[in-house]
């Protein structure tokens, strides 16, 4: 989603979408399923530090790089124990706020072969830094939803504030 008729924001949309899905997502999956031999430190190329993570059961800041990599290592170990092979993305959306800030939302169906082992809806707050893009906050929840609109519909506010 970008502002109408703004070619700069359309360029940002293409750039960040390629970075997230072609680079970050593919690398994350290949490290998690061990088709790429790397430790969890790779994530510091994509996730900022500090990183805020929030779900129905956690709400915390990961301040140090080792906290970020430990959090990822724990998640990936749990997935590997379940036989993780890949992640399907049944729905996603990218909202460009300005050339330096976007939100990326997705439903991730984490799988062991054809069996779903985990289904999450995720919201990534992503900002541009001097080198590339960085995720600075992640919110997530378990879901059975098939679409983001089903799970997180847009609500238009009806505010009673002062009107000019």
Question: Which residues does each PLM region occupy?
Answer:
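A solvent-exposed, acidic/Ser-Thr-rich amphipathic alpha-helical stretch
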Residues: 38-100
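Short beta-strand edge/turn micro-motifs at domain boundaries
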Residues: 118-156
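Beta-strand residues in well-ordered beta-sheet regions across diverse protein folds
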Residues: 54, 104-105, 136
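Short, cysteine-centered beta-strand-loop-beta hairpins and adjacent loop/turn segments enriched
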Residues: 81, 110-118
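Hydrophobic/aromatic beta-strand elements that line small-molecule binding cavities or substrate pockets
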Residues: 89-95, 107-110, 121-127
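Short beta-strand segments enriched in hydrophobic/aromatic residues
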Residues: 47-48, 108-110, 139-141
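Short, low-complexity N-terminal intrinsically disordered segments enriched in polar/charged residues
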Residues: 1-46, 155-164
């Amino acid at each position: 989603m970008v502002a109408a008729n703004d070619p700069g924001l359309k360029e940002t949309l293409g750039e960040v979408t390629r970075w997230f899905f072609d680079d970050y997502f593919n690398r994350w999956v290949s490290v998690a399923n061990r088709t790429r031999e790397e430790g969890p430190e790779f994530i510091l190329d994509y996730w900022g530090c500090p990183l805020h993570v929030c779900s129905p059961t956690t709400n915390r800041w990961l301040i140090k790089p080792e906290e970020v990599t430990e959090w990822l290592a724990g998640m990936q170990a749990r997935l590997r124990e379940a036989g993780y092979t890949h992640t399907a993305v049944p729905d996603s959306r990218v909202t460009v706020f300005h050339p330096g800030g976007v939100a990326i939302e997705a439903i991730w169906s984490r799988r062991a072969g054809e069996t779903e082992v985990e289904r999450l809806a995720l919201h990534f707050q992503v900002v541009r830094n001097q080198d590339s893009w960085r995720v600075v906050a992640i919110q997530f929840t378990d879901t059975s939803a098939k679409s983001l609109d089903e799970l997180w519909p847009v609500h238009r506010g009806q505010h009673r504030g002062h009107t000019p």
